[in-house]
Amino acid sequence: MDLLKELESLVPELERGLDQASSLTELEELRVAFLGRKGRLAQIMGRLPELSPEDRPRLGQAANGVKMALTERFEGRKTALEAASEAAALSRFDPTLPGRAPWRGSLHPDTLVMEEICSVFRGLGYDIVTGPEVEMDHYNFEALNMPAEHPARDMQDTLYVTESILMRTHTSPLQVRTMLARKPPVAIIAPGKVYRRDSDITHTPMFHQIEGLMVDKGVSMADLRGTLTSFLRNVFGGDTRVRFRPSFFPFTEPSAEVDISCCICGGKGHVGNEPCRVCKTTGWVEILGCGMVDPAVFTAVGYDPEEYTGFAFGLGVERVAMLKYGIGDLRMFFENDVRFLSQFS
């Protein structure tokens, strides 16, 4: 049977071709020639109708066996050529050389300071609250005892979206929102971004603040002093000295500015024989503002100022980071300079 002989000759013929194939391209050409849709095996199978009905099953069975043999030999040669190609590629460099570990980033100093502050206040039983950065004028000013045309609004260069919508200038609106949603006692801190129309070595249009609020029956200025002293010594060290100075904020009465002994000179006013550039030789640096919540704020949120008292405070995260890490220029926090940021890894 001529067709059977042609079929049986395909295997040794392919083997000779495989021995001569030196690349995957030549191997693919062989596959198409023998196993392709118009290849040698397909041509032989196309002549099956020429055979008698008795011979067709035998030739079909033989064709299946030949196809399996051709495929097996082809795959074997393909594996060998792929291994040779990979070995040739590897020969161009030394795979035993030690690898280079991927570069790892680090947390931003703002993030480090915010996490540390939040951790301290969590330990004191405070909740962490967040809210919208695009805020209503009512929550940002009016409910905080700063009605329209109040001169205290001039203390903050506000970015307005519309006449009644603005970019929040502090996170105090979250204190109002929380008091409207909860009944006393309330103990929260509100970290987040705030916005003001200002930009220089000590100011940026966007920065981070953390503001706190405690409301309950019998809360006093002594509680405020004790809380903030404990917090500041947790962040800046147990030897840190803390002092309170009278001040003014429209939503607290009485109000105070809080200073700490200078982190750079240790409160001495000088470093060696040089005057301290941070505290300007005073030995003190301003760190935050605070006070007892004004009764007008309680009235605005539906609290009875005759029954409840509370204190509030606020501080800039970048301010804390600058003092804690000795950073001289606020703008460095926002320039994404890896040389600066990698120091905090």
From Swiss-Prot:
List ligand-binding residues for Mg(2+). Answer: E253
Q: Name one GO molecular function term.
A: ATP binding
Q: Name one GO biological process term.
A: phenylalanyl-tRNA aminoacylation
Quaternary structure, from the entry: Tetramer of two alpha and two beta subunits.
The EC designation for this entry is: 6.1.1.20
Q: What is catalyzed by this enzyme?
A: tRNA(Phe) + L-phenylalanine + ATP = L-phenylalanyl-tRNA(Phe) + AMP + diphosphate + H(+)
The name this protein goes by in its record? Phenylalanine--tRNA ligase alpha subunit
